[in-house]
């Protein structure tokens, strides 16, 4: 009886989603021109070919704290950290695991965590699991961030007065430590725009806040040899922690949290998404190593990708009333308001052989539904022109 009741409940919620045009479903791969994947540099196919020459066990057989750790992984972590100008790093099984592990265990009770309103769902989930007091600031709005930081200082002062009085009355020492954290993405996954990173770093220093930057969509695209936006701006020593993921431009799977040795040791001890999971298999780590070999190669270049991004933007501005979100990243978004309308336009593009997907509410705010178009090194100008031939009709 209870099983039937829960099934009825699930069905009612799903039906409600369908009626609101919010229902999600899985699709298999297709032979359309790829404007959808995060494989910006086409590494997934290159690495696939390289890894065919290696033979590894099918699984790690345990967590990194038990049977799943190897010198190969630790050497790889240090190699990646050196490449990005960090002291060290810790590999997680996915970008989601990395953000959840980092943000859930670092900010503590009475700490303040301030996040951009458009951070990735994994950062939101990690923040929700922390004991910190959480605030959002308006997307990429420096004034809004400073307002939150200044109010955080006022809140801290009030708490300190209360705790000082309490500890004085109880004749105990004051041991509470207050920290402020800012969590952002360097390139935002649903808009493709870049964080105002230099200004945010300046504010973090002014207010003594620890900055956490997710570089998922900047790695491989910005900075020398794809080191990321933090490195491009020379801010490596100004950021408390960086999350670099391997599942986007690197064409692999997994992620690494970059920072100090103390941060790494702390995560090994307290990040539950690291501690309580089987380590990724060795062939996953080998593919990551191969990706970094490609990045470090003297032949590496992402100039064609940036040319195609520029070409796309040039074509977009020629269509009157086309609302393009400002972005110089590989993620280009065209606003098509309304879930049904956005899906309809995406279907027209797919019917002409172009794999372009609609991003609809609630993933993005209502009225800001969009076509999310990803540029790749392997795309062509002719393929881009086909997009705008459809949009002009």
Annotated model-derived regions:
Residues 57-95, 117:
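Conserved N-terminal alpha-helix of the aminotransferase class I/II PLP-enzyme fold
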Residues 225, 231-266:
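Active-site PLP attachment segment
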Residues 42, 304-310, 319-353, 363, ...:
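Conserved PLP-binding catalytic core of the aspartate aminotransferase-like
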Residues 102-121:
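Conserved PLP-anchoring active-site segment centered on the Schiff-base-forming lysine
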Residues 135, 139-213:
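Active-site phosphate-binding strand-loop segment of PLP-dependent enzymes
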Residues 2-59, 209:
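N-terminal "arm"/small-domain region of PLP-dependent enzymes with the aminotransferase-like
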Residues 46-47, 82, 351-352, 363-393:
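PLP-dependent enzyme catalytic core of the Aspartate aminotransferase-like
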Residues 249-314, 321-325:
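PLP-dependent aminotransferase class I/II
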């Amino acid at each position: 009886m209870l099983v039937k009741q829960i099934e009825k409940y699930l069905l009612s919620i799903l039906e409600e989603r369908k009626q609101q045009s919010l229902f999600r479903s899985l699709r298999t791969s297709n032979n359309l021109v790829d404007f959808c994947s995060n494989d910006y540099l086409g590494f997934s196919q290159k690495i696939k070919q390289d890894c065919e020459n290696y033979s590894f066990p099918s699984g790690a057989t345990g967590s990194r704290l038990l049977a799943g750790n190897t010198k190969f992984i630790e050497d790889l972590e240090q190699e990646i950290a050196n490449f990005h100008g960090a002291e060290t790093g810790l590999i997680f099984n996915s970008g989601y695991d990395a953000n959840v592990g980092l943000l859930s265990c670092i900010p503590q009770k009475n700490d303040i965590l301030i996040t951009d309103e458009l951070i990735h769902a994994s950062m939101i989930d990690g923040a929700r699991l922390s004991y910190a007091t959480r605030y959002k600031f308006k997307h990429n709005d420096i004034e809004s961030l400073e307002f939150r930081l200044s109010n955080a200082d006022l809140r801290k002062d009030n708490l300190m007065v209360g705790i000082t009085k309490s500890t004085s009355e109880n004749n105990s020492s004051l041991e509470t430590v207050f920290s402020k954290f800012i969590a952002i993405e360097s390139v935002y996954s649903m808009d493709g725009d870049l964080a105002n990173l230099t200004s945010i770093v300046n504010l973090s220093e002014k207010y003594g806040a620890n900055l956490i930057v997710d570089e998922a969509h900047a790695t491989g695209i910005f900075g020398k040899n794809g080191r990321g936006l933090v490195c491009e701006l020379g801010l490596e020593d100004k950021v408390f922690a960086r999350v670099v993921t391997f599942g986007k431009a690197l064409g692999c799977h997994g992620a690494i949290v970059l920072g100090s040795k103390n941060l790494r040791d702390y995560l090994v001890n307290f990040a539950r998404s690291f501690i309580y999971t089987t380590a990724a298999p060795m062939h996953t780590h080998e593919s990551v190593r191969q990706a970094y070999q490609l990045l470090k190669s003297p032949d590496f270049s992402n100039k064609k990708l940036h040319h195609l991004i520029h070409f796309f933007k040039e074509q977009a501005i020629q269509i009157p009333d086309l609302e393009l979100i400002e972005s110089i990243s590989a993620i280009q978004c065209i606003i098509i308001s309304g879930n049904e309308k956005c899906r309809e336009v995406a279907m027209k593009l797919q019917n002409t052989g172009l794999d372009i997907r609609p991003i609809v509410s609630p993933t993005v705010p209502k009225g800001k539904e969009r076509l999310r178009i990803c540029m790749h090194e392997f795309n062509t100008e002719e393929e881009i022109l086909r997009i705008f031939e459809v949009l002009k009709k």
